[in-house]
Amino acid sequence: MKNTNPNSQPVELNRTSLFLGRLLIFVLGILFSSYIFN
């Protein structure tokens, strides 16, 4: 897999992965806390 646009592609992937990671941790935290307190 060659990088045709090395300037914009990795930044976009980094932002997307960071956003998805935070969102996943946030949702998992809410589900876990609600499961425990329920």
Swiss-Prot record:
Transmembrane domains' residue ranges: 17-37
Give the GO terms filed under biological process for this record.
photosynthesis
A Pfam family: PsbL
Q: Which cellular components does GO assign to this protein?
A: photosystem II reaction center; plasma membrane-derived thylakoid membrane
Alphabetical UniProt keywords: Membrane, Photosynthesis, Photosystem II, Reaction center, Thylakoid, Transmembrane, Transmembrane helix
Q: How does it sit in the membrane?
A: Single-pass membrane protein
Q: Where is it mostly found?
A: membrane
Q: Where in the cell is it found?
A: Cellular thylakoid membrane
Q: How does it assemble?
A: PSII is composed of 1 copy each of membrane proteins PsbA, PsbB, PsbC, PsbD, PsbE, PsbF, PsbH, PsbI, PsbJ, PsbK, PsbL, PsbM, PsbT, PsbX, PsbY, PsbZ, Psb30/Ycf12, peripheral proteins PsbO, CyanoQ (PsbQ), PsbU, PsbV and a large number of cofactors. It forms dimeric complexes.
Query: What is its biological role?
Result: One of the components of the core complex of photosystem II (PSII). PSII is a light-driven water:plastoquinone oxidoreductase that uses light energy to abstract electrons from H(2)O, generating O(2) and a proton gradient subsequently used for ATP formation. It consists of a core antenna complex that captures photons, and an electron transfer chain that converts photonic excitation into a charge separation. This subunit is found at the monomer-monomer interface and is required for correct PSII assembly and/or dimerization.
Regarding protein family, the annotation reads: Belongs to the PsbL family.
What protein name does the entry list?
A: Photosystem II reaction center protein L
Organism source for this protein?
Answer: Prochlorothrix hollandica
Q: What is the lineage of its organism?
A: Bacteria, Bacillati, Cyanobacteriota, Cyanophyceae, Prochlorotrichales
Supply the gene name. psbL
